[in-house]
Amino acid sequence: MSSKRMDSGSKDIISNLPDALLCHVLSFLPTTEAASTSVLAKRWRFLLAFVPNLDLDNMIYDRPKMGRRKRLELRKSFKLFVDRVMALQGNAPLKKFSLRCKIGSDPSRVNGWVLKVLDRGVEELDLYIASEYEYPLPPKVLMTKTLVSLKVSGTDEFTIDVGEFFLPKLKTLHLSAISFGDEGGPPFAKLISACHALEELVMIKMMWDYWEFCSVSSPSLKRVSIDCENIDENPKSVSFDTPNLVYLEFTDTVAVKYPKVNFDSLVEASIGLRMTPDQVFDARDLVNRHHGYKRCKGANAADFMMGVCNVKTMYLSSEALEVLTFCCKKAIPVFNNLIHLTVETDERVDWESLPILLKNCPNLETLIFEVPSHILFLHDLTHFFSNT
């Protein structure tokens, strides 16, 4: 190969790309890696100042086997690194800010970063905060007109203690282990109603059994996933007014009542309703069964199940199947549109509602049983199918 061809082949083509394109490429890297490119050449030295996405994570360095002193040093250096990046970027527009970090008892440093990116008009905010204490979410997070996506999670509860919300552009909201200063339920309802463009709602580790009511009301919502941790108490009142919802994933203890259930557009539902441990004990007690015990006290899933009866695809947990037996004070509704049904099985759970459910699915095409790998009780299936 000639020296001329060698010289041509060794040209730094990437460095000759436009700044905007290079910054776009760097935006896909973790910020620590993007920052390391500044040593490649003078051309790269200040590109980080204009990268529109920041992905900051110090959890990858915080390993259990690492000594305490080393962990503290890494946390300190991480904070200094974030401070430098913030100073370098100044007030440049920011599209996404993702932060995973472990903090001590003082969250002011983290809150300062969050408030800074909010001032810069960030569109996507993704926070994972590992803390031994409740983390008070800065009120401004819930009063930001530029946010399109907000995801908040961590190792402990996040506290929302504000009375006003304003998130007019928010389309995606993911919250994990959130508690509200007012435990009555109104703040949660106000939060949802303040998100006029909301399309996806994910709530994990919710604890609303002590609320006076819980209401999910939004004409724009299309997908909802809610997983409630409470198991010992039945929620007092749960309502859904989501006429354009197409997908629902709902795990909760059966409520005392469901005053409003509006799922007019629902296509697919994954139902994980369950009874409290006391209700399960009473339901499975052979003496109670002998004396005709058929209904659990203090809970009624009938109105909720009536609300989902138009779905085309449905998944029922084994506990939800038992809820149909004991917690539906009205008859199990007819699922005229149901084509695909998946039922989780458990040898401890009552199957009495299954024959009725199948009779009430006149257009069912696919039936799948999720059977635990350690057991296959075909004799039970044969018995139930013989009665359908």
Curated annotation (Swiss-Prot):
**Where are the LRR-type repeats located?**
151-177, 180-205, 228-252, 313-345, 346-371
Keywords, A to Z? Leucine-rich repeat, Repeat
Manganese listed as a keyword: no
Query: Per the database record, which ranges form the F-box domain?
Result: 11-64
Q: Which CDD domains match?
A: F-box_AtFBL13-like
The record ties this protein, via Pfam families, to: F-box, LRR_At5g56370
Q: What is the lineage of its organism?
A: Eukaryota, Viridiplantae, Streptophyta, Embryophyta, Tracheophyta
This one is known as: F-box/LRR-repeat protein At3g59190
InterPro entries attached here? F-box-like_dom_sf, F-box_AtFBL13-like, F-box_dom, FBL60-like, LRR_dom_sf, LRR_FXL15/At3g58940/PEG3-like
- Key word Ubl conjugation present: no
The species is Arabidopsis thaliana
